[in-house]
């Protein structure tokens, strides 16, 4: 069975085709930048995919760095946004070398994580987010876990994990504080958190 990374490599063009023209998340990105409250803030688009929200953040005035583990999605991101800095890396690997950020956008980035991996993901975010920096976290709320995904008649080992807010706060290990919930769609939740402890950088 093919891997989660294979899924995003194989479906990269589909995501780009769907989301470069879809501005559903634009109001959330605007609100995110308002929460940061700085001119030209430095923002990490974590699990940026093909770069569509990186593009919008830049148009809104942010200095954007995108990070994703899909080589194919990043090829599209770089071709469409040559002025944005993109890095191929797993969110479970340290990225402290990228420097400190005023804000992090993580849209659906944690939907494949649970247990210690989820804790590690938040630890890595905390390592680079400045004190009182803003995190926009988008995830599906619940207890369901979908084990596999089929795309173009190919099956992928792509765990899709729903999360409770309590489990997320536990995994954050005191490094983040809940600030506000924006209007959500169905089980998709759009939540703002801020960095509470001193950055390790």
Outline where the language-model segments fall.
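Class I (Rossmann-like) S-adenosyl-L-methionine-dependent methyltransferase catalytic domain
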Residues: 1-40, 50-96, 117-120, 124, ...
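Conserved S-adenosyl-L-methionine
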Residues: 47
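A short acidic, Gly/Pro-enriched loop at the edge of an enzyme's catalytic core
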Residues: 96-104
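Helix-to-beta-strand junctions that scaffold the AdoMet/dcAdoMet cofactor pocket
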Residues: 114-115, 129-130
């Amino acid at each position: 069975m093919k891997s989660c990374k294979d899924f995003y490599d194989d479906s990269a063009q589909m995501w780009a085709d769907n989301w470069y023209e879809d501005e559903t998340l634009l109001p959330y990105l605007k609100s995110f930048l308002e929460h940061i409250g700085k001119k030209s803030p430095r923002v990490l688009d974590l699990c940026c995919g093909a770069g569509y929200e990186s593009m919008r953040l830049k148009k809104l005035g942010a200095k954007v760095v995108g990070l994703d583990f899909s080589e194919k999605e990043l090829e599209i991101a770089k071709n469409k946004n040559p002025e944005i800095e993109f890095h191929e890396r797993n969110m479970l690997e340290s990225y402290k070398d990228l420097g400190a950020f005023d804000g992090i956008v993580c849209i659906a980035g944690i939907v494949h994580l649970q247990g210690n991996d989820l804790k590690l993901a938040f630890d890595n975010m905390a390592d680079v987010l400045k004190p009182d920096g803003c995190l926009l976290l988008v995830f599906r709320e619940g207890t369901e876990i979908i084990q596999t995904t089929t795309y173009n008649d190919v099956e992928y080992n792509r765990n899709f994990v729903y999360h409770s807010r309590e489990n997320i706060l536990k995994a954050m290990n005191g490094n983040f504080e809940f600030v506000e919930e924006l209007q959500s769609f169905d089980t998709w939740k759009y939540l703002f958190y801020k960095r509470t402890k001193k950055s390790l950088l």
